[in-house]
Amino acid sequence: MPPKRNFRKRSFEEEEEDNDVNKAAISEEEEKRRLALEEVKFLQKLRERKLGIPALSSTAQSSIGKVKPVEKTETEGEKEELVLQDTFAQETAVLIEDPNMVKYIEQELAKKRGRNIDDAEEVENELKRVEDELYKIPDHLKVKKRSSEESSTQWTTGIAEVQLPIEYKLKNIEETEAAKKLLQERRLMGRPKSEFSIPSSYSADYFQRGKDYAEKLRREHPELYKDRGGPQADGEAAKPSTSSSTNNNADSGKSRQAATDQIMLERFRKRERNRVMRR
């Protein structure tokens, strides 16, 4: 026969010890959970908003201000809603102070500080009277009420406008233009001469003045120009033709004598115009 195997059997005492260890571990975990829950509940209570001052009087507060106890059968969501409703219903902000209460506090403070309330009130009344005198308007500065007969607007109401003839309109226009011209002349007379006598183009003004001056001389002294014109005509008849060298010299002299200020001014204007267009 084959030999029998020996199996180790756990005794009853070992099983009881294991059970005790498991129970102790479970009880420790439950205790930790209970402590954590109690801590959370305590923090929630600290975060709860306290009830404020009721807006109603003390008699109405005694009847209405009592909060009904919440039944244990309600769910947690309904409990939170009831707490919020009661909080907002009873919490109010006191903005208006009771005048009697303020007066009583001032009187008590004055008694403690050793002041006489009647004397203080008399001084305040005197100061108020002085201030009222400062703000008082004298009689000559007050606005007087005018009647409808005294006001100027009442005289013009109801009067029909009359259309003036064209002669009056033309006369007004002429007088206006004459007044404008006179005003402009006065303004120019008040300014120094150098401000409005500067020409817009120096080169054009120079040549124009020279031309006007030459014409003026020809009109006033024609005998001078007659003497100059005769020899020139005789000389031209005597010398009908000249050499090419003399012509070239004359042309070069004429081109040198030609004024280039106007040409340079036109070039400058073109350059500035092109520069502005590029921008």
UniProtKB/Swiss-Prot annotation:
Gene Ontology biological-process entries? negative regulation of ubiquitin protein ligase activity; primary root development; regulation of photomorphogenesis; response to high fluence blue light stimulus by blue high-fluence system
Cite the record's Basic residues compositional bias ranges.
270-279
Q: Which UniProt keywords apply?
A: Coiled coil, Nucleus
- Top-level lineage group: Eukaryota
Its predominant location is nucleus
Regions of compositional bias (Polar residues) in chain numbering: 250-260
Q: Which InterPro entries match?
A: Tls1-like
Does the keyword Coiled coil belong to this entry?
yes
* Location of the protein in the cell: Nucleus; Nucleus speckle
Q: Where do the coiled-coil regions begin and end?
A: 86-183
Q: What does this protein do?
A: Inhibits E3 ubiquitin-protein ligase activity of COP1, a central repressor of seedling photomorphogenesis. Represses COP1-mediated turnover of HY5 in the dark. Required for primary root development under normal light growth conditions.
Q: Which family does the UniProt entry place this protein in?
A: Belongs to the TLS1 family.
Q: How does it assemble?
A: Interacts with COP1.
Q: State what protein this is by name.
A: Protein COP1 SUPPRESSOR 2
Question: Per UniProt, what is the name of the gene that codes for the protein in this document?
Answer: CSU2
